[in-house]
Curated annotation (Swiss-Prot):
Molecular-function GO term, any one: structural constituent of ribosome
Disordered: region residues: 1-27
One GO location term (cellular component): cytosolic small ribosomal subunit
Keywords: Ribonucleoprotein, Ribosomal protein, RNA-binding, rRNA-binding
Species in which this protein is naturally found: Methanococcus vannielii (strain ATCC 35089 / DSM 1224 / JCM 13029 / OCM 148 / SB)
GO biological process: ribosomal small subunit assembly; translation
Pfam families: Ribosomal_S19
HAMAP family: Ribosomal_uS19
Designated name of the protein: Small ribosomal subunit protein uS19
Record gene name: rps19
């Protein structure tokens, strides 16, 4: 029996660099905990609460605050506009502790970060997460070069 040569680069060893397969890429159907999106959208909220992770389940089972209730009303209004074929306005909210439910998928929501509103398009992959996870409150700090007098070594750096 002939042994296969090992190319050392991983994979099957047949494809060459720069070549792509001719078969069209298929989009895998989205499933959340074994349920498709249409099944999730028809599902009652009580059943959806049972399949989300424990942290979200605890939050949702405790009820909603008045601010969250306002957000739910805005979501229902936007969903009615979508069903009529109109484009809804972006929903602005300060509620970062609200769990993304199946009825919210497809909407655009602006979430307050403490300084500004960050616009987020809710897709299937965001399902069951908190709104606050989608809009980080802290950014990555990129410091510039140190100025004169910042360190002892900068004494010998010529001034521009």
């Amino acid at each position: 029996m002939a042994r296969q040569k090992f190319s050392g680069k991983g994979g099957k060893g047949k494809s060459k660099k720069g070549q792509q397969s001719t078969a069209p890429r298929r989009r895998v159907e989205f499933k959340y905990k074994g349920f498709t999106l249409p099944e999730l959208q028809e599902m009652p909220i009580k059943k959806f609460i049972e399949i989300v992770p424990a942290r979200q389940r605890r939050t949702m089972s405790r009820g909603i605050t008045p601010n969250q209730r306002k957000l739910v009303m805005k979501i229902k209004k936007a969903r009615r506009l979508v069903n009529r074929g109109k484009e809804p306005r972006v929903i602005r909210t300060h509620c970062r502790d609200f769990v993304i439910t199946p009825e919210m998928i497809g909407l655009t929501i602006s979430i307050y970060t403490g300084k500004q509103f960050k616009e987020i398009k809710l897709v299937e992959e965001t399902l069951g997460r908190f709104l606050g996870e989608m809009a980080p409150t802290r950014g990555i700090v990129q410091h510039g070069s140190p100025g004169m007098g910042a360190t002892r070594g900068s004494m010998f750096v010529p001034i521009k």
